[in-house]
Amino acid sequence: MKKMPMRKRFGQHFLHDSFVLQKIVSAIHPQKTDTLVEIGPGRGALTDYLLTECDNLALVEIDRDLVAFLQKKYNQQKNITIYQNDALQFDFSSVKTDKPLRVVGNLPYNISTPLLFHLFSQIHCIEDMHFMLQKEVVRRITAEVGSHDYGRLSVMAQYFCDNTYLFTVSPQAFTPPPRVESAIIRLIPRHNFTPVAKNLDQLSHVVKEAFSYRRKTVGNALKKLINPSQWPLLEINPQLRPQELTVEDFVKISNILN
């Protein structure tokens, strides 16, 4: 089967290292009864491994040439469904299953952050997620309060999920090699976060506004939203910087606005 050309506009870097692929599958630990959704399967390198472990696999691929390639490659497979769709627009709840989805993929680095936010909006139908991402993005997701990497993505990802940095992947594991290191992360949805955000759009807005002015105090960064008299009620020091606030702090700020 002829090789497919890579499209730069889709940020395509195809994983080829069998050791890394086996390590990813081991981390996912798929079961026969699972429903797996692979985002951006490319030429099917990871797909081949997943098919031996799982009886229900859905592929979401935007590149029409790769979709044709995958349809031909897997035309005898009865346990695979291929969706030609933009993952940023895909309705993950449309995948037919009686169990929550397990979502995996080597995410295109140029859309990884908006794609994560799209997945957070559909977190109710997801059991867990395992992704290859740019190492810098994984560090931001898992960053601790007060660290340089802690920001908007950290807060929102940690509100929705428990996140674990699993291992690093070198550029040489890909064709063509990206200019940055990659990393594998596991995200498990949280269904009992306390306090609960009353309005997720409001929470996202507060976090985005605060980190737009991360060098200012949070009192100044959020002065359009929070009156000085409200800070004592929140029990939050308005002289702190946004990166010094916990996820719980941001939820409390969001909730007082409703």
UniProtKB/Swiss-Prot annotation:
EC number, UniProt record: 2.1.1.182
Classification via Pfam families: RrnaAD
Gene3D superfamilies the UniProt entry points to: Ribosomal RNA adenine dimethylase-like, domain 2, Vaccinia Virus protein VP39
Subcellular location: Cytoplasm
Catalytic activity: adenosine(1518)/adenosine(1519) in 16S rRNA + 4 S-adenosyl-L-methionine = N(6)-dimethyladenosine(1518)/N(6)-dimethyladenosine(1519) in 16S rRNA + 4 S-adenosyl-L-homocysteine + 4 H(+)
UniProt GO cellular component terms: cytosol
Keyword Flavoprotein attached: no
Keyword set, alphabetical order: Cytoplasm, Methyltransferase, RNA-binding, rRNA processing, S-adenosyl-L-methionine, Transferase
GO MF entry, a single one: RNA binding
Source organism, top-level taxon: Bacteria
Keyword flag Cytoplasm: yes
Record InterPro entries: KsgA/Erm (IPR001737), rRNA_Ade_diMease-like_C (IPR023165), rRNA_Ade_Mease_Trfase_CS (IPR020596), rRNA_Ade_methylase_Trfase_N (IPR020598), rRNA_adenine_dimethylase (IPR011530), SAM-dependent_MTases_sf (IPR029063)
UniProt: S-adenosyl-L-methionine binding residues: 13, 15, 40, 61, 86, 106
One GO term (biological process): rRNA methylation
Cited PANTHER family: DIMETHYLADENOSINE TRANSFERASE, DIMETHYLADENOSINE TRANSFERASE-RELATED
Family to which this protein belongs: Belongs to the class I-like SAM-binding methyltransferase superfamily. rRNA adenine N(6)-methyltransferase family. RsmA subfamily.
Physiological role: Specifically dimethylates two adjacent adenosines (A1518 and A1519) in the loop of a conserved hairpin near the 3'-end of 16S rRNA in the 30S particle. May play a critical role in biogenesis of 30S subunits.
Stated name of the protein: Ribosomal RNA small subunit methyltransferase A
